[in-house]
């Protein structure tokens, strides 16, 4: 499917918005979904082995935990809405997730030796991810970065298996 023109560059037409949304959803959004969830499962799996089931309290900065507690309260006040999950890792932004990885890189490096490269990749991904998630139109370079990191992320879970770590969904 050829990329449609960014609808924001033309006179408003709802059909252009629909075309853009379908294209971006099919082209990239699902890859972000997979990529972020693989990273969350990877971090949870490794830190569960290294620090135990309650790794969240031991391995995550207090400010991040406070932000998560605030978000949990917001969700609990609207129980009819979708819930991100029970574990705090589902409530953190990509930037906070990257901070958790950075602080715990000494544990993660045992399984993913190139974790420092991943820290840079995740930081590079934040703006393209937010552009797409906030319903804006990413440039081709950003879409290509999402594609590249999605492909690279496929190699992360086999690293768990190689180290005899079962993937643990938070």
Language model: regions and residue ranges:
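Amphipathic alpha-helical interface elements
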Residues: 1-170
């Amino acid at each position: 499917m050829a990329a449609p023109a960014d609808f924001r560059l033309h006179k408003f037409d709802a059909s252009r918005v629909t075309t853009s949304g379908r294209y971006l959803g099919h082209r990239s959004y699902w890859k972000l979904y997979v990529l972020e969830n693989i990273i969350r499962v990877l971090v949870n799996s490794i830190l569960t082995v290294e620090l135990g089931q309650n790794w969240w309290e031991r391995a995550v900065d207090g400010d991040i935990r406070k932000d998560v507690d605030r978000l949990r309260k917001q969700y609990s006040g609207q129980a009819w809405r979708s819930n991100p999950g029970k574990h705090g890792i589902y409530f953190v932004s990509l930037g906070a997730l990257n901070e958790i990885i950075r602080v715990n890189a000494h544990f993660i490096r045992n399984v993913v030796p190139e974790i420092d490269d991943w820290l840079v990749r995740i930081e590079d991904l934040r703006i393209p991810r937010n552009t797409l998630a906030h319903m804006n139109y990413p440039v081709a370079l950003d879409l290509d970065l999402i594609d590249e990191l999605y492909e690279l992320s496929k190699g992360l879970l086999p690293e768990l298996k190689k180290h005899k770590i079962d993937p643990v969904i938070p």
